[in-house]
Amino acid sequence: MSVTYNKKKKRNVVVGVVHIHATYNNIIVTITDQQGHSLVSTSAGAYGFKGSKKATPYAAQETAGHAVKTVVEQNGMKTVSIKVSGPGAGREAAIRAVQACNLNVTSIKDTTKLPHNGCKLPGRRRV
């Protein structure tokens, strides 16, 4: 029987940032410390959601909840700020899942990038 040890030191991170990237096809949740070093990164596909089910609010809720519980157990996180980007359907569900994990949420910020009349959009699809 072989036992493998994680070579990365367990750090006690009390304050962190939850990055939620919600697209039309998937949701990606990354939890970092305040300097931006990644602690946990996961997506809806990692929890068994496939195809169009990855973009549902339920998948976003499960993904965010699992990621936050993992980082609380491993690093003892108590306070987070939330940054949400993307136009996906699971934005609010993921925020609610983070708030339900008994963490102190200091701020919720929308970092979705919007063009100020930049590049021309591609034409409509003709089938």
From Swiss-Prot:
Keywords: Ribonucleoprotein, Ribosomal protein, RNA-binding, rRNA-binding. Gene3D superfamilies: Ribosomal protein S11. Pfam families: Ribosomal_S11 (PF00411). GO terms for biological process: translation. The keyword Transport does not apply. One of its GO terms (cellular component) is ribosome. The keyword rRNA-binding applies. GO terms for molecular function: rRNA binding; structural constituent of ribosome. Located on the platform of the 30S subunit, it bridges several disparate RNA helices of the 16S rRNA. Forms part of the Shine-Dalgarno cleft in the 70S ribosome. Belongs to the universal ribosomal protein uS11 family. This is Small ribosomal subunit protein uS11. It comes from Ehrlichia ruminantium (strain Gardel).
